[in-house]
Amino acid sequence: MEAMNEQDEMLVMSGKEHREVLKRMLSYTKYHIPSLIWTGVLVLLVTLADVFAPILIKIFLDDYLTPMNLEMQALLILGAGYLGLTIGKSIVWYFQLLYFQKIALEIVQQMRIDIFTKLHSLGMRYFDKTPAGSIVSRVTNDTEAVKDMFINVLSTAIQSLFMLVGIYAAMFALNVQLALYSLLLFPLIVFIIFVYRKYSSQFYRARREKLSQLNAKIAESISGMSIVQQFNQERRLVKEFEKINKDYYDVGMKNIKFNALLLGPAIDLIYALAVVIILSFFGAESLIGPVAIGTIYAFISYFDRFLEAIYNVMERLAMYQEAITAASRVFRIMDETEEVPAQLNDPEAKITRAKIEFKDVSFAYEGGRDVLKNISFTAEPGQTVALVGHTGSGKSSIINLMMRFYEFERGDILIDGKSIKSHEIAELRKKTGLVLQDSFMFYGDINTNIRLYDKNITDEQIVDAAKFVQADGFIQTLSDQYQHKVIERGASFSSGQRQLISFARTVVTNPQILVLDEATANIDTETENLIQTGLKRMREGRTTIAIAHRLSTIKDADLILVLSKGRIIERGTHDTLIAEQGVYHSMYQLQNSGMDLDAAL
């Protein structure tokens, strides 16, 4: 849905917006001015070679061939000059292309760094509403289109500009009157370029959006492959993909037909008109006196090169439109305001005792109803507060606010008496250990997945942390132990093993606040028994907020909060809640009888 809305917005991009995108793209060249100047000099040399080549042929035709004045020395000089121009042009062309490629690659490299950096500053709301495939498309495909613009469009524009100026200078030098007549074709050329630019832009915008939708569908299918196969969704997804792919094909065919209609025939028409003008002019001249054949050749050759330059510009307009469209999509991310919740960064706001207070906190996701309503509780330093409730009751939302993934609308969260908004985000994350139900693992090895590239963490600390959470036992059975390779998302490990590694990752940072999001939900009973002792030791001296699926794991919690529809409906210790024989008591009894917690509610 987001991609389609974006397409509608871009189809009405104004001229001012178009210029702003171009200006912003060109701003990336400011660090490459010396290289661009040098490349411009090389382009000028190539242009001069193209301009002087017809003059050498003209001299040969008019001064030597027509009057039959075949002086060998002069012919050798002309031949050597023409050959030298051709070889020199080829050498200079190589370096010109090399420099343009280098500049383009460096610009796109910086642009990708900028957009990747920006993505990591955005809040979770942005990722909730934007398909992952669309984001990947912008970082890869769209920046690649920008690279093509600098390599092909910018180089062609500079070269064509020099070529047009050089050609007209040579034409005026040869025959002022005919050069003036040729200017009559300019309005037609400008009109064709205007029409081509106006209509081709729509096709290229649509193509970029369809490509983004293709990437989004592919990413969705791959990330959910197990569900797709389990529920026999392959045929449905293939049909959806075929539809998007067909739309992409249809847009591409419309663009090809438009190019075939306007590029080739239009340029051929202008060339035919130019030849008619030249032949008519020299035909009239021949009635008065002799006509220089070399001059006729030079003019036709110049018009051929002139129209070739125009054709190249029009052909590159397609790339230009694609690059403008792609760049506007990239800049939309860079201009995105849905950033990580802002922090006041009060220097006096330090986490020392780790006392946590929720005061009448209410929160809603994008455009929805409140998922948390007036939540209030206090976790004293070193205490464990457990959150229980059915799916959608608001447990994970409390964790998300605690980690500052989202901004809450009303109320406040205090840590050691200071608003959570006052703490530096880096300190807050550093002193808070988070263990999720679905633990994520990166490419690399077990060592780096526990250390997370923190050079201050030693190998000894990694081993101690793994032993602390009972992960060392299974790691020692692996062939490379702590250097054992981890593939994407740790797919070669069981859920329990991934969870144990995530425990070690948290313990090794020695956090003051511990947040457990159903951390033992994916652990089998035997493994859970192994880590319960470790978790109990880990909670000692740390303020802990834990979402519990198995109520048996939170009997020793200092405070248990029972949530339903975003509200706290019961609170107390395990014993007091059991004695009250309310919702928690029913949940506990039903779960002990083997029923699921959600079924209990």
Segments from the language model and where they lie:
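Helix-loop-helix
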Residues: 71, 170-184, 258-328, 334
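Juxtamembrane helix-loop junctions of ABC transporter transmembrane domains
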Residues: 10-18, 41-42, 49-62, 85-132, ...
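ABC-type nucleotide-binding domain
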Residues: 276, 342-343, 349-601
